[in-house]
Regions:
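Generic recognition of flexible, low-complexity loop/linker segments
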Residues: 2-3, 48-51, 168-171
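Generic structural signal for hydrophobic core residues of well-folded globular domains
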Residues: 17, 29, 33, 186-191
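Generic detector of solvent-exposed, compositionally biased contiguous segments
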Residues: 27, 39-40, 53-56
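Post-Walker A helix-loop "phosphate-sensing" segment adjacent to the P-loop in P-loop NTPases
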Residues: 31-44
């Protein structure tokens, strides 16, 4: 499969006939937000997410995330038969993954060497719940503190945000007020309590 980069730093409109990869690209993007292979809208009769997007040991999806203080990358890779994540504290550079002959490096050690020692590379994040906690800022637990800088929002109550994003990506009918209220409720740090006395 040829190497491809897609810039998504503004409004993007995908057009094309059936089977050219529009939904494939949207699902890869949705996976960044929901990290839930069962909720990507892949029909049961199609190949699984892992089999389709990561057919080879050197298959990767790299997401570059822009933030106020610079960019970082989220690397999705297959390890021990399932997709896991690593965070790289640097803007994306294709030279990390592709050699001068335009071939993708086959070993993680080669990629690590290309990234170099000057950029932080996280340990493997194998739990999808932990990954979502990292990017949605539910990071008060001690083991998540090194990942705090990778949060795209800061909320312990983020659970409805990935669902709402998923519904937008999968063209589910949504009301704008529902989306707005979901985001507002997710950002609130207040604990709601109900007095039954």
């Amino acid at each position: 499969i040829p190497y491809a980069e897609v810039k998504l730093d503004g409004n993007v409109h995908f057009i094309g006939t059936q089977g050219v990869g529009k939904s494939t690209l949207l699902r890869a993007l949705l996976f960044f937000y929901n990290a839930d292979k069962l909720r990507l809208g892949i029909p049961k009769e199609k190949k699984s997410f892992d089999a389709f997007y990561f057919p080879y040991p050197n298959s990767y999806i790299v997401y570059e995330v822009m933030r106020e203080n610079g960019a970082y990358c989220v690397l999705a890779l297959k390890n021990q038969g399932r997709v896991m994540f690593r965070f790289i504290d640097a803007p994306f550079d294709s030279k990390w993954f592709i050699d001068e002959r335009k071939l993708v490096y086959g070993e993680w050690s080669q990629i690590r060497e290309q990234v170099g020692k000057k950029h932080y590379i996280s340990s493997l994040v194998s739990s999808y719940e932990m990954y979502r906690d990292i990017i949605f800022g539910n990071n008060r637990r001690l083991e998540l503190q090194p990942f705090r800088k990778y949060a795209i929002v800061e909320s312990a109550k983020y659970q409805n945000i990935p669902r709402t994003i998923q519904n937008v990506f999968l063209n589910t009918k949504l009301d704008a007020d529902f989306i707005k209220n979901t985001i507002i409720r997710s950002m609130s740090d207040e604990d709601n309590s109900i007095d039954l006395n």
